[in-house]
A protein has these predicted regions:
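Patatin-like phospholipase
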Residues: 1-38, 46-278
Length: 278
């Protein structure tokens, strides 16, 4: 059987859907040779590669209402709505330990997408030889809500700005068949934003401004390519089967739990698809 890659969309706390899907995969013993994630999708996938079932849900259940995790106070004091040092420092190192040894020893090729602020182009980081927590922080640093992250001589932000759905990248890496986990329901399309906020905040980085203001177009183009591949049998797309109307900063633990449970159910159903078996 031809190897399949795994492509994971971001979406901040909508990523609890992805957490449920990946836990369903862990329960079934399903692994992939290639995983590429964007923003929250990459962060959540780490616990899949490290085989820590349920870790993503425990983090959100425990800390969603902790101001260190997400609060206006964070934004006013650090420039980031989400507490990035808490999420990518205290939690994995001390509070809900991440299994670095299993993650690093995994044969899975794990790729995280970031955006180069100065070029307005995506940058792809493998897990080997990198400070992966800093890369994850950069990939999840949403424009307007997070400061720019410096790493390896680059200025980085949210990978979703330049490659929200890295289908084309997976093809370039030799994976013609892929499982794609989306955090939006069927039929979703992005709309063009107003152009002035990006110009006002990031005017010194014109290529980034262009990326922010055209993200809607690249997202919709990538989604159309994925749906075409799905129709042709080259992609298995797992997306929310019910639209629970979850926001990026959802505060209801009950709704986030429902989203996680939906992901587990949809993931388990996806495993029954014959495209997994040929």
């Amino acid at each position: 059987m031809e190897a399949m890659g795994l492509i994971l969309e971001g979406g901040a706390l909508r990523g609890q859907y992805t957490a449920g899907v990946l836990d369903a995969f862990l329960e079934a013993g399903v692994e992939f040779p290639y995983v590429i994630g964007v923003s929250a999708g990459a962060s959540i996938a780490c616990s899949y590669v490290s085989k820590q079932h349920g870790r993503n849900r425990v983090i959100v259940d425990t800390y969603r209402h902790d101001r260190r995790y997400l609060s206006l106070t964070n934004w006013l004091t650090t420039g980031s709505l989400f507490g990035m040092d808490f999420i990518y420092g205290d939690i994995p190192h001390r509070l809900i330990p991440f299994d670095f040894a299993t993650f690093e020893a995994s044969p899975t090729r794990f790729v995280t997408v970031c955006t180069d602020v100065e070029t307005g182009r995506p940058v792809y980081y493998d897990k080997e030889g990198e400070d992966h927590l800093t890369i994850l922080k950069a990939s999840a640093s949403m424009p307007f809500l997070s400061p720019i992250v410096e790493y390896g001589g680059r200025l980085l932000l949210d990978g979703a700005l330049t490659d929200s759905l890295p289908w084309a990248r997976a093809l370039e890496e030799g994976f013609r068949r892929n499982v794609v986990v989306l955090t939006r329901p069927a039929g979703y399309r992005k709309r063009a934003p107003q152009s002035w906020p990006a110009k006002l905040v990031y005017g010194r980085y014109p290529q980034l401004v262009e990326a922010i203001n055209t993200r809607w177009s690249q997202y919709n183009t990538s989604l159309a390519a994925i749906e075409e591949a799905e129709a042709a049998g080259h992609a298995l797309v797992i997306r929310p089967s019910v639209d629970l109307k979850i926001g990026r900063t959802e505060s209801s633990l009950a709704k986030l739990g429902q989203l996680y449970d939906l992901g587990r159910r949809d993931g388990a159903e996806g495993l029954k698809d014959p495209r997994f078996c040929r």
